[in-house]
Each structure stands twice: as structure tokens, then as C-alpha cells.
Amino acid sequence: MDITYDDLPVEIWIRILKFMKDSAVNLVLVNTDFFKLIYFKKNKFYELKEFNFGMQKNYVKQRITLINYVVEKGYLDIIVYINNLKSNHNPLIIDNIKILGSISKDTALWYSCKNNNLATTKYFINKGASINSSSLPLKTACIEGHLDTVKYLFSCGIEIINSIYDCIVSACCYGRLNIVIYLSNKISIPGDYINEAFVMACKYGYLDIAKYLFNLDCSITVDALYGACINGHIEVVEYLIGLGVDPRKEKCWAITSACQGGHLNIIEFLLSLGIKPKEINVDAFYHACKTGNLEIAKYLKEIGADTITRRDWALELSARGGYLDVVKYIIELGVSQKSLNKALIDATLFCRVEVVEYLVDSGSDFRQNDDYLFRSIICTRDYVEMAEYFIMKGVNIIVNNNEPIKTVCHNGCIGILKLLIMYGVDYNPIKDQLINIAKSNNQSAIIKYLEDLDTLK
């Protein structure tokens, strides 16, 4: 039995909408009769958006307006229906504008091109959306690989300007060979754009596109090799070497790029071409370490590459990145006291607790420059765990006339404020000063906590 809007009392419809949660928007869009259910929505609809983090899928509840939703989905009949109601000043639209929302024609065109909704693309262009005020609709269609949409935009008389040429570069970044072929046949693309497109194709590993562009007589630069090396595209690397690209340029920067990307197979391949370890750029070791590639750092040492010249930098940036295994390895190789101290600053700045503890155990001076790390870094960032570690190690928590507690009040670091008081900082003589510092920096949580301290006692 079919159910219409008038078959059920309002209270039941409200319960149904609540029960359907993220699917409620689809109920409203079943037909024009059910569309009246938006009267019962107090807040915007929402849908669950899927986001992938590595191998794990996550869903985030995201508020949506009805018009954005139907445009994104390409529901042309509903779009036309809503626009007709709007043109007639229908109360259903006027009274529910918060739920319905609004969208410009140009934005709607962009959504349509992004999702390859050709029918809505045609509709919004006919309604006056501009295909020439921005290259975004065309560029988006190129990135997504929607050839039919790209063809239609050109059929509408799109202006050929520099931003249009850039679309072939964007298509190369996403491996859209069909788009690259169409654009190169449709318009005359300047050589600079073809050259950049070739570099992007190599960088992102699209060998088929690289080969196609090479046949268009593009210029081959070493930048294409660097991009392929850093991203681990061994087939592209082999292809470029076959074309005559010299891997020895800039002190074998191709190997340095592979070190940064963590691609041992590419390093070994390049060395097999006759490159000597001593020819490798001194930055190779540093780049391997700063990106946490311990295996490559060890490999460079084993083959006799320079691991000394940039060792201090390597330690500092591996500490900054929190790569404890790399930090341990570099310290085993031998570093100066100055290097240990600078690495501790970086690790503290980026709250790498395990690295900080290891560096301190290895001899880094955690009290350097009158407890600078504690008073000027930790106390400005509310690193509570690290603050307690430093306090337990013996930093002066009232250094420079109570600078730490003043700093946390200035920066709103309430966790460390509580910690300092717990470990015995006498706040009473300077309580008014601390409150004034917090007030001048709009730190309401600090103000409330300080004012409530006597009550808590």
C-alpha cells in the first residue's frame, strides 16, 4: 500500500525522520508529496562521508543543505522542481531556506563537472553558469577523467587561455591518458606546458602518459628523473635512463631523491650504472634520515657514502620527525654535544617524548640556556607529559622570576599550570598578576581556574 504525506500524523513523520538519521534526506526526495517533510526539519540534514586512512575506513557525520546534496548527486528533476518553486516564491522554499540552502550557478556547475553529471552540467550552463570566468570546471573534469564532460565544455566555446593549458598538467598528475590525448589533439599546447606535463607524469608514475608526451617532442629534463626516484617508480626511472637522462647530474641527486623517498631498489639500480658511492651527494644520508628511512641510512654507510658531512642535520631532523630508531643509529655513529643539544630542541619543539627521553639519556643538555626548553617551548604549548618529565628531571620551575607559570597563563596552557601548582609553585604572591596576564590574552579557562583555586582548597 502506498503511503502519502497526509496518511500519517505530523508526530509520526517527525519520529520517522529522526529514526532514519542520515537517510532522512532520501525520504524527503522520494516524490513531491514527501518533499513537504522539510517543514519538520529543525536542523540541516546530514550524511555519513567515508574517509580512508590507510587500510581503515572511517565515517564522519557531515551537515548538508538539500540543494547541495541534490546538485552533487546530479538529481536534475529535483533541481528543476526546487527552482520552479523558488521562482514562484512558494512558502515551502521561503520558510525552509535554512534547510534548503543556496548555491551559485558556477559552484553548481563545478559539482556537476566533478561528478560527471552531464545533464546537470548542460542545465546550469543553459541557466547562465560561466565556463570562462574560471578554469575550475574544466580542470576538475580533467582531473576526474570525465572525457564526455570535457568534450561538452569545449563544444560550448570555452576560451583557450593559459589556465586551460594547465589542465593537461593536472590530467597528467592523475594519470588521465584519455584526457591528455584529447587535449593535445584539440588545442595547440605550448611546449612549456607539455614539458611540465611530462615531468608530472614521470613523478606520479604514469609511464604510458610519459611515452605519449615524449612522442609530442617534449623536452626531457632531469627533474622528471628526480620525481620518479622520490616516488619509487622504477619503470619510469629505467625509461628515462634509456632516453639518456644523466643520473650523475647535481652530484647524483637522483640517488638523493630515492633516499628521501625510501626506495632502495632505485638506489641499487642507479649504482649499477657505474656511479661510485663517493659521487653521491652529501645530502643523501640527511634526506634518508629526516624521512625515517633507517634501512637506507645504514646502506649508505655500508657502501661508503658520505654519512659525516650532514650527520648533525640528520640527527636534528630525524629527532624532529620522531624517528627514534634513526636517532639511535646516528648517535651510535658518533655526534657532537652541540648536535645532541640542537636535536633535543627539535624533538622538544615537536613533542617527541620518546626521542627526548633517549636524547637526554644519551647526554643532551635538557637544562641548556637556563632551562630554555622548559620555559620557552614546553610551557608555550601545553606539552603536559613532557613538562612532567622535565620537572622530574630537575628543571627550575621558578626560573627567571616565575617565568614558566607566567608563560602558561599567557598561552592558556592549563594542563601545565595545574602541574606547576601540584609540584609546589607558590602562586599566591603573584596570583593577581597571573590573572591579569590571562585576562590580557583572553585565557578564560586560566582565569576561572585561578579564581576558583581558593574555593577548591
From Swiss-Prot:
Disulfide bonds: none
Transmembrane segments: none
SUPFAM superfamilies (alphabetical): Ankyrin repeat
Coiled coil: none
ANK repeat start-end pairs: 62-91, 104-132, 133-162, 193-219, 220-249, 251-279, 281-309, 310-339, 341-368, 400-429, 431-457
Top-rank taxon, per record: Viruses
Keywords: ANK repeat, Repeat
InterPro entries: Ankyrin_rpt, Ankyrin_rpt-contain_sf
Keyword Repeat: yes
Gene3D superfamilies documented for this protein: Ankyrin repeat-containing domain
Keyword ATP-binding: no
Entries under PANTHER family matching the protein: ANKYRIN REPEAT PROTEIN, GH09064P
Protein name: Putative ankyrin repeat protein L112
Species whose genome carries this gene: Acanthamoeba polyphaga mimivirus (APMV)
